[in-house]
Amino acid sequence: MSSPSKKLLANVRRIVPPMLERFHKGQLGRVAVIGGSAECAPHISLQWHLQGLSHVICEPSSATVIKSYSPNLMVHPILQSSNTVSSFSNSPLPHPHARALAEPVLSFLSRLHVLVIGPGLGRDPVTQEIVTEIIKEARSREIPLVLDADALLLVQEHPDLIHGYTECILTPNVVEFARLAKALRADVSSMPDSDAGKSEACKRLSNALGGVTIIQKGPHDTISNGMVNIVCDVRGGLKRSGGQGDTLTGSLGTLLAWRKAYHEGLWDTGESEASGGRELSRQDIEEDLSICGYESGDDGERDGDKPKKKLSRPATLLLVAWAGSAITRECSRRAFMAKGRSMQASDLTDEVHGSFLDLIGEPEGTKL
């Protein structure tokens, strides 16, 4: 593993909550996935293994399938679609009652730390209108968002929904990235097909969206918030199966919940608060990512050193994006080594715990 990757992993470990007896149910993460339609259900993976409380908000017809995944899931079949709203065919777009139709979900948001939108969502017009209202409300409440799959279509058609909302992560594949860039008129077509070219393209698209963090999936995952670019070069598997992206969105949901706990001081990190009151520069964020807060240990290992100051929010958001990518790629590598060509997205689930321990590991203070 490269030295930059080791340094990033050392910083990721700082935002992972230790397992303490005083924590109670839900403190380490209340995350909901909005997805699951008449056509498809999300393949739920990582967050169900690592966080506190796991919710799925879905269309009624997919609820039974999703419930069969695990008894640990709390499934809420309250997402409306044209199958459940008979008056939609006579209503213009945007739907005049979209806000009212979204109300059962909106009233649920106060219970959540993070919202993941897109896996298995589908493109039903009623559902898309309702999800638009959900994104607006989540943004007003400053709830971190992860948008993938069909949720990216909403961004493509209505970029103002998330423009400038820096608590949001998009996870487009190559095709989705190109569509977003075209819709936003981001000049990326002239970029060379290299890591440097992809980083610049990712940066341009992020800037076109006002600094939203983007993970561009590919042979190496490229991550940018419009100021700082990082690349995840953790080796992945060679098989691409439908549903693998849900492992990424799941891991991001979990990591964002841990990030929230870190910044709210849920446990004593031994760090001093970072100086506030000014906008962070690119150099500030890059210094955070290079673990300049450590007195020594420039290979990224802890070596008993204590960080002097807390990581900034922009830095931890980039770390979440990078760590989600790294864990997903490691799960894919392990699953491919075990199953080869027969590997399916569900095989990644069995590799989650080992991948987490090997890459990040339990933080100091955890008693197992």
Curated annotation (Swiss-Prot):
One CC-aspect GO term: cytoplasm
UniProt cofactor(s): Mg(2+)
Superkingdom of the organism of origin: Eukaryota
Chemical reaction(s) catalysed: (6S)-NADHX + ATP = ADP + phosphate + NADH + H(+); (6S)-NADPHX + ATP = ADP + phosphate + NADPH + H(+)
Amino acids binding ATP: 217-221, 236-245
Predominant location category: cytoplasm
InterPro entries noted in UniProt: Carbohydrate_kinase_pred_CS, CARKD, Ribokinase-like
Sequence positions that bind (6S)-NADPHX: G120, N173, V174, V175, E176, F177, A178, R179, D246
CDD domains: YXKO-related
Enzyme class: lyase
Pfam families xrefs: Carb_kinase (PF01256)
GO molecular function annotations of the record: ATP binding; ATP-dependent NAD(P)H-hydrate dehydratase activity
The keyword NADP is assigned to this record: yes
Domain YjeF C-terminal: 3-359
EC number: 4.2.1.93
Gene Ontology biological process terms in this record: metabolite repair; nicotinamide nucleotide metabolic process
Compartment list: Cytoplasm
Keywords on record: ATP-binding, Cytoplasm, Lyase, NAD, NADP, Nucleotide-binding, Phosphoprotein
Family assignment from sequence similarity: Belongs to the NnrD/CARKD family.
Annotated function: Catalyzes the dehydration of the S-form of NAD(P)HX at the expense of ATP, which is converted to ADP. Together with NAD(P)HX epimerase, which catalyzes the epimerization of the S- and R-forms, the enzyme allows the repair of both epimers of NAD(P)HX, a damaged form of NAD(P)H that is a result of enzymatic or heat-dependent hydration.
Record-linked HAMAP family: NADHX_dehydratase (MF_01965)
Protein name according to UniProt: ATP-dependent (S)-NAD(P)H-hydrate dehydratase
